[in-house]
C-alpha cells in the first residue's frame, strides 16, 4: 500500500519529537539536563527519511463535518493586557504564571541558566519519565516558511527563551525563571535552532509540546501553550495542527484538556495506594 504525503508528514513529525525527547533523556541521565523522557522503543526503529524541508509544508486538510472550526473565543487570549473579566479562571494569559515581577530580566537571546549555588543547595528530585506528550504544530502558509527574525521576535513576546537542547522553552516566569511549562522545537530534523544564523533561518513548521508529568499546573501551562501557538499562527500566517497534522479544532483542544484531567486522576490514584 502506497504511503501518501500526509503519512510521511506524520512520521517525520514523530521522528523529530522523538529525537528531541531522546536527547533530553540522555542529558538527564548524564546529570546535565532538566528534562527526563521515556521513549517508546518502537520509535527508534522508524526509518530515517532524508526528505527535503518542503515536504513539511501545509498538509492536506481532512474535512471533519462534526468538528467546528477554531474560533476566536475557543482558545485562551494571547495578551496579558486585556480585561480579566472576559476569561475563565482556568485559562490564564501568557504572563499569569510569573513567579515575581521584581526578578531581573535576562538578555532575551541568552540561554537560561540557573545559579550553580542554588542548584547545589536545592535537593535533587528525580523526575518521573514522561508518559504523554501534547503537541501543537504551527505550519506556515507561506511557501518560504517562517523567517527567522520574525519567528524569534514572536516567540520572545510569548515568553519563550532559548535554552537546553538548542530549542525554546517557556518557563513559569516571562523572565525565563522557574520550571519549564512547555517547549518549542523546529519541525525539521534535527529539531534545533541556530541563533548565530537566525537572519538566514527559515522553517516550514514548528512544534509546541508539553510533557506529562511535567509542570505543577499542567492545565494552566497547556492554555499558555495554546495561546503562544495561536499568537504565532495569527501574526505569521500559520495554520494550527494537532499531533496527527489535522486541523486543530475546538474539539481537539478540549480533548487535550481531557487527557490532562485523566492523567491527573491516574496520578492521584497512584499516590493513594
Curated annotation (Swiss-Prot):
Periplasmic face of the membrane: 1
Superkingdom of origin organism: Bacteria
Membrane topology of the entry: Single-pass type I membrane protein
SUPFAM superfamilies: Cell-division protein ZipA, C-terminal domain
One GO cellular component, as annotated: cell division site
Quaternary structure and interacting proteins, as annotated: Interacts with FtsZ via their C-terminal domains.
Function in brief: Essential cell division protein that stabilizes the FtsZ protofilaments by cross-linking them and that serves as a cytoplasmic membrane anchor for the Z ring. Also required for the recruitment to the septal ring of downstream cell division proteins.
Protein name as it appears in the record: Cell division protein ZipA
Protein source organism: Stutzerimonas stutzeri (strain A1501)
Record lineage: Bacteria, Pseudomonadati, Pseudomonadota, Gammaproteobacteria, Pseudomonadales
Encoding gene (name): zipA
Amino acid at each position: 500500500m502506497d504511503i501518501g504525503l500526509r503519512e510521511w508528514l506524520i512520521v517525520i513529525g514523530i521522528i523529530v519529537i522523538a529525537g528531541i525527547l531522546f536527547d533530553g533523556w540522555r542529558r538527564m541521565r548524564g546529570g546535565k539536563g532538566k528534562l527526563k523522557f521515556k521513549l517508546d522503543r518502537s520509535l527508534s526503529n522508524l526509518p530515517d527519511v532524508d526528505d527535503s524541508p518542503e515536504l513539511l509544508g501545509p498538509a492536506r486538510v481532512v474535512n471533519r463535518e462534526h468538528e467546528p472550526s477554531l474560533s476566536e473565543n475557543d482558545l485562551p487570549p494571547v495578551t496579558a493586557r486585556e480585561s480579566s473579566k472576559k476569561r475563565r479562571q482556568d485559562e490564564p494569559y501568557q504572563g499569569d504564571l510569573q513567579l515575581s515581577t521584581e526578578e531581573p530580566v535576562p538578555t532575551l537571546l541568552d540561554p537560561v541558566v540557573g545559579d550553580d549555588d542554588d542548584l547545589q543547595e536545592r535537593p535533587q528530585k528525580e523526575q518521573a519519565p514522561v508518559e504523554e506528550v501534547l503537541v501543537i504544530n504551527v505550519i506556515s502558509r507561506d511557501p518560504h516558511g517562517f523567517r527567522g527574525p520574525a519567528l524569534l521576535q514572536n516567540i520572545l513576546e510569548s515568553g519563550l527563551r532559548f535554552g537546553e537542547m538548542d530549542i525554546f522553552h517557556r518557563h513559569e516566569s516571562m523572565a525565563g525563571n522557574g520550571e519549564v511549562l512547555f517547549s518549542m522545537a523546529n519541525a525539521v530534523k534535527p529539531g534545533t535552532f541556530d541563533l548565530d544564523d537566525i537572519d538566514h533561518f527559515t522553517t516550514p513548521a514548528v512544534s509546541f509540546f508539553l510533557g506529562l508529568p511535567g509542570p505543577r499546573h499542567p492545565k494552566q501551562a497547556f492554555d499558555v501553550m495554546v495561546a503562544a501557538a495561536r499568537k504565532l499562527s495569527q501574526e505569521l500566517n500559520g495554520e494550527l495542527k494537532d499531533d496527527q497534522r489535522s486541523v486543530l479544532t475546538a474539539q481537539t483542544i478540549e480533548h487535550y484538556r481531557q487527557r490532562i484531567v485523566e492523567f491527573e486522576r491516574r496520578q492521584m490514584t497512584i499516590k493513594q495506594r
